[in-house]
């Protein structure tokens, strides 16, 4: 008799045709809410429609349905991303000087937009070199395209069309996985399977295929371009892929095929998988052979990581077990219950992801200039400044979003009855200690960092430079930062003997790299001025964290309002009967946190912009003499508030203020208009709802007199809506003002 083990049944993880596709539903605004679907009585309706359209929690309490909506929306998001990418590549193919730039990247600026000659705006088409007139772009796409081996505009066209096809495919997938084959809740909660697929598939195979592309296509094409070969003479990508002898002429180890791999003689491949460090002196970018090696290594790591978790085969880690075993001597139940939180609250999940993604986006901002990855990126100062600023803002917004969704989790998804003595419960129980200590740290940092500047302003005003904190008087050197720099500069001879240079020239020790008479990168000196502004960074970051963390930890209750959880995520005040309870909702903490995030990031990008112009960016003469854009004035000028106002804001705003009548005049108009948008926000932030309602009643009376009153009653914005509109215009106006100021300046002088 043969005893067979029972066959494990394959679980069916999708529902077929769960929701029929209906254009009638689609055409009925607010179909997701009984109240909104009735149509507008007052103008508040349109605001509620926008506020709740994507708040899937408010449509239904069924977690499976919510999960499906989020999943479907992700495909819509991907579709928009592909559409945007397609547009970028199409502009490169149709309206750009990419081929001209490729032939002479040091003298020709990148442009992919030509303004039509209407109302005289053709003045905006400046001469970017090589006889091409257009708007100079600072997105870094040209440098990225060169690094990936794109040599002509036809290839850009094909990629643009491919991206459109993918956009359509994503739209279809979003519809299909909601209406035709919708995953069950168990599928969304199968974290081990998800980890395996995301790690091995997205990150592992993704990195591996990119490494493959770099080795077989990017490296040989860039080798030819660096040698000055005309792009039209370079073999096409498929010729390198199909013809190994062609690659072997450039990288001899290709002739040996896979033999060195299987005989473990891996060092043979060092000609195209290198470990050099530093920058390529021809392009001022990281060595592309280093980058290929990096992606191959990352691929191996993630392919291994993608096989660690227990799925159908019964071997590997179980995430629930890992979390529940995570206990220390002082942490009570540790992470017990965290698995349940993260598989039933997508807000908690999203909060963690936003915090990590935001942090890594800020890390990207800092690496883009210190280790410029693409050819000729380092000498395109406008692009350098834009990429840093962009990634800093994005990172700031994502981190505030992390706090927002953590607070929504606390209000909507946290169940205090089932949580006892786990880490989250312990944090909540000593939240007063956390917040009061953090508050003390903020006060300390604020008074001391600002106090150092005020001292300097006072001494400067009284004509006592010898009593100022500066590199030439009372020194406050950032000794820890200098030690970190020094350690990394010495790494190639000590901790990384295989490397020929340190990871970044900014650490020091190395020589400068100049390309086409412009500085790509050099060791960045840190002194008293940096010590001062770094403490302003510490101050603004801690205040942002204080506001956001207070919002999360007190989202459900506080001494002032013990029943806050019942009032929800956003509410203006605790009813008319209790004074002094406004701006206590979790939503209000996000609102207030956004302003401090704006403060924090502004100081960072101002510091970066001035420091780079003063100590890094500039031209180099044939004799090797470096002339920086602002002549190294950062160390002595930025140590007073007056110096920041006079030598940074005012002195460097001259380009945008004087841009009228030149090809930069659009930035002058934006500078003006964005100031206006910013000022407009104050109207919403400083005035109350009653003021506007009173005005509206008067205007409605006039309409009634003339018999032109609308059927929908006008209503003043609610308090929360007014704050939302206010902070949006504040941030939008502030960011656009900064953008115009930075770009007009750097395009003019860079």
Curated annotation (Swiss-Prot):
InterPro entries: PSI_PsaA, PSI_PsaA/B, PSI_PsaA/B_CS, PSI_PsaA/B_sf. The chain crosses the membrane at residues 70-93, 156-179, 195-219, 291-309, 346-369, 385-411, 433-455, 531-549, 589-610, 664-686, 724-744. It is found in: Plastid, Chloroplast thylakoid membrane. It catalyses: reduced [plastocyanin] + hnu + oxidized [2Fe-2S]-[ferredoxin] = oxidized [plastocyanin] + reduced [2Fe-2S]-[ferredoxin]. Disulfide bonds: none annotated. Coiled coil: none annotated. GO terms for biological process: photosynthesis. PsaA and PsaB bind P700, the primary electron donor of photosystem I (PSI), as well as the electron acceptors A0, A1 and FX. PSI is a plastocyanin-ferredoxin oxidoreductase, converting photonic excitation into a charge separation, which transfers an electron from the donor P700 chlorophyll pair to the spectroscopically characterized acceptors A0, A1, FX, FA and FB in turn. Oxidized P700 is reduced on the lumenal side of the thylakoid membrane by plastocyanin. This is Photosystem I P700 chlorophyll a apoprotein A1. The gene is psaA.
